[in-house]
Amino acid sequence: MDYFTLFGLPIRYDVDGGLLASRFQDLQRQFHPDRYATSPECERMLAVQLAATINNAYQALKHPLKRAEYMLSLHGFDVNNEQHTMRDTAFLMEQLELREELDTISQRSDADEVLTTFAERLQVMIGTRRSHMRHELDNETWTDAADTVRKLRFLDKLQQQVEELEEQLLDR
């Protein structure tokens, strides 16, 4: 059973977060291992496995990028497979330039302002890619969606680096 079906949701990228959380809580209550404490060993083990599956499913569906990755996995695309190389050299060059730019920001006297501008630009890039991804998933163009998800993963890592630098600048 796929994660969407487990939560009684249609298989599509856009998910009602409130409904997802509500169904998660219902499933947690229904299959919590403590409810099976006096049950036979096989039922207790099944409850533990179900609880783990429910938690994994919730985490996968809750986060937009993980949800897209999961949807692609349902169609045979493993975006976590590092053997698939990024062939978009323009995107890779852009990533190198962005990382170099981020590396130089901390050395600047106006690092806070420059980092804010950089973070805003990055958010626009992420928003644009997410829009492309949503369109590709909705239209079931799985190969294009997988490519976009891989690009979003690069941008997501860059976003994490921005947040780390923001914390470092606050600690100064």
Curated annotation (Swiss-Prot):
Residues 2-74 form the J domain. SUPFAM superfamilies: Chaperone J-domain, HSC20 (HSCB), C-terminal oligomerisation domain. Pfam families: HSCB_C. GO terms for molecular function: ATPase activator activity; protein-folding chaperone binding. InterPro entries: DnaJ_domain, HscB, HscB_C_sf, HscB_oligo_C, J_dom_sf. Disulfide bonds: none annotated. Keywords: Chaperone. It comes from the Bacteria. The keyword Chaperone applies. GO terms for cellular component: iron-sulfur cluster transfer complex. Co-chaperone involved in the maturation of iron-sulfur cluster-containing proteins. Seems to help targeting proteins to be folded toward HscA. Belongs to the HscB family. This is Co-chaperone protein HscB.
